[in-house]
C-alpha cells in the first residue's frame, strides 16, 4: 500500500542520509 511504501521510503532515506554523512 502507499502507507507501506511511504514508511519504507522514509526509513531508507534516513539510512541513506546517515551513510552519506559517515562517508562525507
UniProtKB/Swiss-Prot annotation:
Keywords: Olfaction, Sensory transduction, Transport. One of its GO terms (biological process) is sensory perception of smell. The keyword Transport applies. Antenna. It comes from the Eukaryota. Present in the aqueous fluid surrounding olfactory sensory dendrites and are thought to aid in the capture and transport of hydrophobic odorants into and through this fluid. Belongs to the PBP/GOBP family. Homodimer. This is General odorant-binding protein. It comes from Antheraea polyphemus.
Amino acid at each position: 500500500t502507499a502507507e507501506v511504501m511511504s514508511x519504507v521510503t522514509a526509513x531508507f532515506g534516513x539510512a541513506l542520509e546517515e551513510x552519506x554523512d559517515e562517508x562525507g
